[in-house]
């Protein structure tokens, strides 16, 4: 079967890999000049299987209001002038009940744990290097009230069987030795040993090469202008420079899935949530992180690659703009300099922003649409890297008409159309 994948980020390229593995003739198109040029370019680098949790949770509306008044807020809301922004926020607020949280959490954990297994199989199969590390996540708390608040998170970890260890301030240095220099700034910690890290862009670039070896064709600089269909069947996808026919189409366009598929009267509940990152060279390995550290106060993650440190986080609801305000850079620089002052060179740091495709219930859209041959693999929010291989394998199995290895019937767009 000929399958056309829309999007060459980690979701699209991973989908292409599993579709090719299943024996399909696969073509990938993207508007960028290469793979992983947008949301997958410089994310925080965390494979956060243990930290898979919905944004929409009980108590979040109150927390969000408090964050807005902080000097370095982890969440920022800027009206984009659209009614849709308000509608999306309202849908998210409706998911902030305990019942919805539990349903959404179960779905997300299911995908993330499956993705963990897919990464295990993939690495055993390919031996790919993407600067990955399996040394866990260390969440640090700067205030006693954060330590107390974490008890609710720990209860969730226990409910879903996620291994963890609570840490006293001085014990944090067991996992991140450089933090011994700043123990006085830490009130406690939480270590999740089963989490991992890796460079999403490097992974996607290497997977692109493996896909090519399997015969997958890539066409870049392709802006989609029109999708033609005959009844409930997609016939062709037209770009400004070409026309592509396929037996099946997979949409993995991240935030732009909504705008591209709007012409088909498909209403995808995806909103772009902007995030930021700094990438700086390691200057002193002993003063740099070993794995990934999540600063609970600032909602910022600091992740170690081979010779680089990635500092990423924050969430901004401001539409599709990707400006780089100096204030956000200052927040990232403040956090990494406060915890790892001797680790890297901020004067050589590169500053980046990207748009995460977030759904109101934080769960991605995977599977069928009302069109017989149009499938989705999009809307992963901040967990696109974590869920990438699991989501892609699910998508490939659904396209192929195979039984999926985990439940997938509640992941499709239909849950918003009931």
Swiss-Prot record:
Segments traversing the membrane: none
Gene3D superfamilies: D-Amino Acid Oxidase, subunit A, domain 2, FAD/NAD(P)-binding domain
Stored InterPro entries: DadA, FAD-dep_OxRdtase, FAD/NAD-bd_sf
Pfam (any one): DAO
Cofactor(s) required for function per UniProt: FAD
Single annotated GO MF: D-amino-acid dehydrogenase activity
Positions with a binding annotation for FAD: 3-17
Signal peptide, first to last residue: none
UniProt keywords, alphabetically: FAD, Flavoprotein, Oxidoreductase
Keyword Flavoprotein among record annotations: yes
Gene Ontology annotations for the cellular component aspect, listed alphabetically: cytoplasm; plasma membrane
Domain of life: Bacteria
Catalytic activity: a D-alpha-amino acid + A + H2O = a 2-oxocarboxylate + AH2 + NH4(+)
Gene Ontology terms: biological process: D-alanine catabolic process
EC number in record: 1.4.99.-
Function recorded in the entry: Oxidative deamination of D-amino acids.
Family: Belongs to the DadA oxidoreductase family.
Annotated protein name in UniProt: D-amino acid dehydrogenase
The gene coding this protein: dadA
């Amino acid at each position: 079967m000929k399958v056309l994948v829309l999007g060459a980020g980690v979701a699209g390229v991973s989908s292409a890999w599993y579709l090719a593995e299943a024996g399909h003739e696969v073509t990938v198109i993207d508007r960028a000049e290469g793979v992983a040029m947008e949301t997958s370019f410089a994310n925080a680098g965390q494979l956060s299987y243990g930290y898979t949790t919905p944004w929409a949770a009980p108590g979040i509306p109150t927390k969000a209001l408090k964050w807005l008044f902080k000097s370095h807020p982890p969440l920022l809301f800027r009206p984009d002038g659209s009614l849709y922004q308000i509608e999306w926020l309202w849908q998210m607020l409706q998911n902030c009940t305990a019942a919805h949280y539990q349903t959404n959490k179960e779905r997300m954990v299911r995908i993330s744990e499956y993705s963990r297994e897919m990464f295990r199989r993939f690495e055993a199969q390919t031996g790919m290097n993407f600067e990955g590390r399996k040394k866990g996540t260390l969440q640090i708390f700067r205030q006693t009230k954060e330590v107390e608040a974490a008890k609710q998170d720990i209860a969730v970890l226990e409910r879903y069987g996620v291994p963890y260890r609570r840490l006293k301030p001085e014990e944090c240095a067991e996992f991140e030795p450089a933090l011994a220099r700043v123990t006085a700034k830490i009130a406690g910690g939480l270590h999740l040993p089963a989490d991992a890290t890796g460079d999403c862009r490097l992974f996607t670039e290497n997977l692109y090469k493996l896909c090519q070896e399997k015969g997958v064709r890539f066409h870049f600089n392709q802006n989609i202008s029109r999708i033609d269909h005959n009844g409930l069947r997609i016939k062709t996808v037209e770009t400004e420079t070409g026309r592509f026919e396929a037996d099946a189409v997979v949409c993995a366009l991240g935030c732009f899935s909504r705008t591209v598929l709007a012409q088909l009267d498909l209403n995808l509940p995806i909103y772009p949530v902007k995030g930021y990152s700094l990438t700086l060279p390691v200057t002193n390995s002993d003063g740099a992180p070993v794995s990934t550290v999540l600063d609970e106060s600032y909602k910022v993650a600091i992740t170690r690659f081979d010779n680089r440190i990635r500092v990423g986080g924050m969430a901004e609801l401001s539409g599709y703009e990707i400006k780089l305000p100096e204030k956000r850079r200052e927040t990232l620089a403040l956090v990494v300099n406060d915890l790892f002052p001797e680790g890297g060179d901020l004067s050589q740091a590169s500053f980046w922003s990207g748009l995460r495709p977030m759904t109101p219930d934080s769960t991605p859209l995977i599977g069928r649409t009302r069109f017989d041959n149009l499938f989705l693999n999009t809307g992963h929010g901040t967990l696109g890297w974590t869920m990438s291989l699991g989501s892609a394998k699910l998508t490939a199995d659904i396209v192929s008409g195979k039984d999926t290895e985990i439940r997938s019937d509640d992941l499709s767009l239909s849950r918003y159309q009931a």
